[in-house]
Amino acid sequence: MDPVKIQELEDQLGHPFNDKRLLIRALTHPTFSNVESMKKGEAKRDCPHQETYTTLGDAILKADLILLLVDCDVKTKGNITILKEDLEKNLKLADVGERLKLLENNLILHKIGNETKVQEGAVTYRSDTVEAIIAAIFIDSGDSMAETKKCIKKIFGPEFDELKKKLLNPQ
């Protein structure tokens, strides 16, 4: 993996990883893990991949989005729920992944097949990887919700800027 592209990604995330293996795991799709394990003659799960991180990242994302919405002065449970659900949708996460250039910079390690298959699954690959990266940041920061929240605020910057405009100028 290109160290320059990893550095660019860390800059975009606002988090320099102390343990780069956590980031590499977050960027490793199960298809790559399984192929690499089979090459080494190992069991499929011996090569760490993003699946567990995706689950953890999803939970952390939900909690931090709520905190960020409260910080934006969203006052009601209903509004927080609606806005959080919009921000955590796969399409929104895929937009974030596209801004991070996860596929474009070949940062997602995968063995999915040809380019057509990659493009067909691009939304899922990007959104899952964004969630996995959030988990990797959380673990790398010593389970710091504050550090993870700071990074989520940065990578969701355009979405929160748009939200603030809507809150200031409701239609």
Question: Which functions belong to the PLM regions below?
Answer:
Residues 1-171:
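Double-stranded RNA-binding/processing signature
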